């Protein structure tokens, strides 16, 4: 029986985290503000400066793009 109670309590905890489903939207918005430039912006800057976005057949990561943009300044 105690194991069942344990699973029930965890299930309730999960529902509480899911409950304020509006909060993740706010969180992502806040983190986006703190990140500075978003990946989309990086791609646009790279395109305008003539920096290739693709390397070895795959897209560059945000950090790699950031480095290349910094170097090109």
Curated annotation (Swiss-Prot):
This is Structural DNA-binding protein p10. Keywords: DNA-binding, Late protein, Virion. The keyword DNA-binding applies. The keyword Acyltransferase does not apply. Induction: Expressed in the early phase of the viral replicative cycle. Residues 1-35 are annotated as: Disordered. Its main location: virion. One of its GO terms (cellular component) is virion component. May play a role in genome packaging through direct interaction with viral DNA. Binds to ssDNA and dsDNA with the same apparent affinity in vitro. GO terms for molecular function: DNA binding. Belongs to the asfivirus P10 family. It is found in: Virion. It comes from African swine fever virus (isolate Tick/Malawi/Lil 20-1/1983) (ASFV).
